[in-house]
Amino acid sequence: MSALAGILVERGFAVSGSDPKPSAVLSRLADRGVRVFQEQSSATIHSLLGHGSQPPLVVLSSAVRDTNEEVAEARRQGLGLCHRSDVLAALINHQPSIAVAGSHGKTTTSTLIATLLEATGQDPTAVIGGIVPAFGSNGRQGSGRLLVAEADESDGSLVKFSPTLALLTNIELDHTDHYPDLQTLIDTLKRFSDGSGALLANRDCPILREHFQADAWWSIQDPDQADYAALALQERGDGTTAAYYERGEQIGTLEVPLPGRHNLSNVTAALAACRREGVPFADLRRAIGNLKAPGRRFDCRGLWHQRIVVDDYAHHPSEVAATLAMARLMVESGRSPLPSQPQRLLAVFQPHRYSRTAQFLSEFAEALALADTVIVAPLYSAGEAPIEGISSEALAAAVKAIAPSVPVRAAANLDQLTDQVAACSEPGDLVLAMGAGDVNSLWDRLSIHGDPERPAAALAL
């Protein structure tokens, strides 16, 4: 929502919005000319009536319920209401655009595409689900021809989008509150891809290979079967050296500053999208060295009593496993971009939603067993009703059953979580907090618990 607000105000629209929680994002929007209300009430709607030549259009996300005071008052006043996806569709469908969808990696991939296009002089407009380090925000209005957008599949609304190029990163069952089974998710993404001008897809994903006919494929496994490919030559904790191929022919090498095979795939996808837009490979190769992942993607918050504290948005088993594998590579290779070299891996994981935790309890346990120590934060319900037998304690027990030698604890609340991290961690530990809920407050809570040695808010992978 904030990315759309910023772009619309730069396009000359009068934009207002409400959020009861002050934040840096709201401050930045206010600085850009967005009128920000810090309460949500019927009075907000009344204050907007009578201003301008047309009545206001009220835009809401899937997280906003019909019982919301502003929504209810807007209906009483006969105002138009639309979903955020309708506004995003209006942007995507009316200019050349690249829309990135998929179960994992879409925020990072769309960030990388926008960053590469900007670095090579294309000046794109971007609407991303995370903070793009090169822009300092999650959205920007560019003067170039292209728009880059993250297309979120969680509520199915991406079927409204008709981009010039649709990009699919991978498919796994998720968002089980909306999709009863994998086939329903596949069908939704097929509707999205069928409505696009062309499809660029990940050949390494077996579900994509089986169910989709892409106009072009990328791979980090088989350059002979993909239009664009990168094969790792050396994997390190601070990045990857890779050979880059187009249509089976090696055309150069890459120094990717983002570690992990999942990031190599994300970078290859971004390169493929930019190459399809005609950006010279030499320009892209120069720009790759400055790539950074979006906010909350292995985001190093700083050093706390010689512990390295990192925040990550991983909340699906595959994401947790990929993030822990990358962290393990940093520990074992002796190389990392972190402020000091990590010696041990302490995973702090917050389950997100009862439905997701119930669906993937054993998969989460297997992924978390990759850590040296595990602390399970209190489950973040995201408004869901509890499910009997599903809890942080149940997940901790599942980890213990798989890996009896791994110390595992479950925290009843965030205060106890902070105390447990302080008690269980050691100097040299990489404390990796993962989840889509409020576990990202761990750094601030630790800072209150004891002064940090060195904040590193600007340091991110």
Predicted regions and their residues:
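N-terminal leader/targeting and accessory segments in enzymes
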Residues: 1-87, 229-231, 251, 259, ...
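Nucleotide phosphate-binding/pyrophosphate-handling subdomain across enzymes
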Residues: 7, 165, 236-238, 247-373
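Short internal beta-strands
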Residues: 13-20, 199-203, 346-350, 370-381
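Phosphate-binding loop of NTP-binding sites
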Residues: 7-10, 30, 44-50, 62-203, ...
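Beta-strand->loop->alpha-helix junctions that form or flank phosphate-binding loops
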Residues: 16-20, 37-42, 82-89, 127-130, ...
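C-terminal helical cap/extension that packs against the catalytic core
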Residues: 32, 308, 365-427
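Short acidic/histidine-rich motifs immediately flanking catalytic phosphotransfer sites
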Residues: 50-57, 145, 426-429
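Short, flexible loop segments at boundaries between secondary-structure elements
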Residues: 376, 449-461
